């Protein structure tokens, strides 16, 4: 059945105009964006099936190639889906500009949706002003964290450029285990020492997983 074969009051567009955007299901909202289905399934059915399998959170993390494995989703629709979630991420980032950091939990919340690829390890730098508000965040490196590969110069160069009063470093563990490794502790010690010399305090090193985090400060590991 095509969308045009539905009763007018049951079509997403008409429901949107009549009752407002909040009245639509996630599948109907997605259908408004993707517009057309296949010969076998209308776009609402395609979106319902897609969301029942993946859900919004997992769908947002699928690559273009993975999206195109879904029945009824070709290259153009896959790009539309990626674009929608990217716009959401950017809106989230803008809303958190100048966010004040009071705890490691604030850092964890701030980082939600900011990892380009959760299957790889990323090292982030958060530059803070004198009120502990985030001035800017940067990706410093991608790959396994290693004290021999992460040079303090790269991190503090960015902090100095942004006139940061203090910094927080953040990285993810793709395994989901957020316990600090020996390499994590070595990197933190090096950065703490460099920060003391430059008078730019390392406030914390936070390791994040999908649902939890580890704070060096909260575990009294900053010396």
Swiss-Prot record:
GO process annotations (BP): proteolysis
Key words of the record: Hydrolase, Metal-binding, Metalloprotease, Protease, Zinc
UniProt cross-references to InterPro entries, sorted A to Z: MPN, RadC_JAB, RuvA_2-like, UPF0758, UPF0758_CS, UPF0758_N
The keyword Isomerase is annotated on this UniProt entry: no
Motif JAMM motif, chain ranges: 171-184
Record carries keyword Nucleotidyltransferase: no
GO molecular function, one term: metallopeptidase activity
Binding site for Zn(2+): 171, 173, 184
Domain MPN: 100-222
CDD domains, sorted: MPN_DUF2466 (cd08071)
PANTHER family: DNA REPAIR PROTEIN RADC, UPF0758 PROTEIN YEES-RELATED
Family note: Belongs to the UPF0758 family.
NCBIfam families: PRK00024.1, radc
Name of this chain's protein: UPF0758 protein Paes_0735
Organism name: Prosthecochloris aestuarii (strain DSM 271 / SK 413)
């Amino acid at each position: 059945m095509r969308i045009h074969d539905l009763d007018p009051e049951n079509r997403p567009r008409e429901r949107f105009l009549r009752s407002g955007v909040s009245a639509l299901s996630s599948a109907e909202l997605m259908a408004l964006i993707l517009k057309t289905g296949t010969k076998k399934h209308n776009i609402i059915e395609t979106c319902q099936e897609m969301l029942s399998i993946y859900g919004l959170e997992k769908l947002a993390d699928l690559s273009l190639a993975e999206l195109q494995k879904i029945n009824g989703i070709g290259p153009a629709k896959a790009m539309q889906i990626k674009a929608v979630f990217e716009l959401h991420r950017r809106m989230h980032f803008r809303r958190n500009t100048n966010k004040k950091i009071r705890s490691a939990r604030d850092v964890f919340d701030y980082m939600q949706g900011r990892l380009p690829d959760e299957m790889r390890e990323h090292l982030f730098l958060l530059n803070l002003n004198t009120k502990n508000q985030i001035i800017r965040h940067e990706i410093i490196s991608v790959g396994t964290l290693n004290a021999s590969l992460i040079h303090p110069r790269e991190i503090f160069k960015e902090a100095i450029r942004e006139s940061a009063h203090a910094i927080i470093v953040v990285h993810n563990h793709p395994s989901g285990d957020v316990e600090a490794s020996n390499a994590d502790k070595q990197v933190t010690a090096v950065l703490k020492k460099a920060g003391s010399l430059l008078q730019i305090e390392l406030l914390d090193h936070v390791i994040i997983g999908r649902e939890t985090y580890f704070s060096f400060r909260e575990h009294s590991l900053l010396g």
